[in-house]
Amino acid sequence: MENVLIFASEKEVRFTKLLKFIVPTYLTSLFNTVYTIIDGIFVSTYVGTNALASINIVYPIVNVLTGIALVFATGGSSVTALYIGGNRKKEADRSFSASSFAAILLGCLVSLMILTNLSAILTILGATPVTIAGCKTYARWWLLAAPVVIGKELFTYFIRVDGAPTYSFITALSGGILNIVLDYILVGQMQMGIYGAALATILGLVLSFSMGIYYFIHKQKYLSFTLHNLSLREAMHCMLNGASEFVNQLAIAVTTIVFNRTVLSFAGEDGVAAVSIIMYLQFLFIGVYFGFSMGIAPSLSYAYGDRKIRICRKLESYARRFFAVAPIIIYALTYFLTPVAVSCFADTSSPVFPIAVSGMRVYGLGFLFSGINIFAAIRMMAYGKGYFSGLITFLRSFLLLLLFLIVLPLKFGLTGVWLAVPAAEALTLLVAVWFLRPIHC
């Protein structure tokens, strides 16, 4: 297999060569974030902040679907990369195929269960009489498109592991551009509201999904689908290795509910709209960390699978330098650019604007710590140690965050809500540093 990220020796490891993988991976993450943000801008501009709040309320459902996709995509791709590094093609194909089939089947079952109880679930998530109609419209589209949503995410990761990060980026870019164009037509020109926004998003995902299928039929370098010797055990192995991503998405779903309900009690529906804006902007900044970490992860897996520990350590030295500098730059950008960024979603005279600006500046303190936490989790997953990855993610995204969301608002009010994330990330960092010790065979 010709793959730019399989290094024969420590001397071959160069940052410029590594960038061939990191840059497309980061751009994929960045562009996914950008077109999600543009989605929000179209909705808030042409439909209103209540519609934006409706989408935010539905996000826990989207997070469940995304979580199912990511648990198999990240876990399965890491296991597959370990097999590729060890030159074990049959096992790599089996891991890839088992992950894909299991993820899509599970996603369809979960979507069906949610659809049959949609009204009750949306009420639990915080839908009000003002937002319930928009919530139902947006949620139904996502649930009905579950196979495409999950398949697109799977292909993004496995195409990258197959040694084609640029093609993976092109699939995301193509779907995103179609989404933006359709947002302009359906939401901006045809005034189709949330229905149009949902349709635009799903059609963009369909394009990316179709390009993924085309790749594995006509352009694959190493991996291929197989029905031979597929086993539940292999699917479970991949799922457990990627458990941290499901924990992350499930945690986002739960904490979004708590965020919405807590902010609702302090600032009403304007506060919920502000949370939506903060979440959009968070994706933009935190995407840098995910892009770098996921970009370097396959190289770590290839080297570890081939027992080339010195290569792993050299790769990690680049990561240490990156995370010594990037968090400071990202927080500085967050602090100074927040007013401009928020004005893309809400008018400066809107009551939503000051809530979002002040909230983002406090919330953004978490970016000083989250990069190392994210890398530590993805690093352990790349080495096939998903249980440690899951622990880091569980702490930062769920346990500590939920604890601080309950405790800090009692003392600091609305500011306490925004402080919960930095507090959770800072405490998790103490654990993450321990997991960044040198790896051994």
Specify the residue positions occupied by each region the protein language model found:
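Transmembrane alpha-helix boundary and packing residues in multipass membrane permease domains
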Residues: 25, 29, 41, 78, ...
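Short runs within selected transmembrane alpha-helices of multi-pass transporters and secretion channels
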Residues: 73, 142-160, 168-176, 197-210, ...
